[in-house]
Amino acid sequence: MRTKAIAAAAILLIWSVLASVTAAGPSQTHHKPSRDEATKAIRASAYEMMKAFLTSDVETFKRHSAKRTLELVSLVFEAARQDPRYQQELQNARITNADQFLGYFLQGMATQYLQAIPLSPEAAARRVANDSAVSFITDSEAKVIAGDSEVARARLVARVWKIDMTDSLKKAVLKEVNDPELRARIKSL
């Protein structure tokens, strides 16, 4: 089932991105936030996104995701829906839209993760988040780094930091998508 392979690869990459950022309180001030305040806000957003992943909370996950990441999820759903190899699986799971598609695979991957690590979603999100770094590119964009690798970008959109995992996910997704038009749309994100 290549749909599961696509989703599993995407979700594993999502998890690695989200698992690398710590929790902190968001900054909602009107002045230009300091880098420390921005770092705290980025980590807060990523923590909430990780917790949403572990609890299969699609709405919260989406709220903290960058638009590009959500567009990628929609394109992956479209690719799976159009591919005859995946249509039965989507039908059996009663998946009719990108949100259900995202929720279905978040739930499966979160269940596996939480079975392997016997912690609450909150504790797991905090635990795996302690080894990340935030490196600013500009005042409105930063790299989220785990170990020696960039795993995501954080982008400031309307004074809220959104986590953009698109570039980290595209390579794995493109390996599984065969439709030339969808491949081109994914590459253009």
Q: What label would you give each PLM region?
A:
Residues 20-59, 63, 67-75, 79, ...:
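Short, low-complexity N-terminal intrinsically disordered segments enriched in polar/charged residues
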Residues 87-121:
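Low-complexity, serine/threonine/proline-enriched polar segments
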Residues 9-19:
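Bacterial N-terminal signal peptides
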Residues 126-189:
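Low-complexity, intrinsically disordered terminal/linker segments enriched in charged
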Residues 62, 74-77, 81, 90, ...:
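Residue-level detector of alpha-helical secondary structure
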Residues 1-10:
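Bacterial N-terminal signal peptides that target proteins for export
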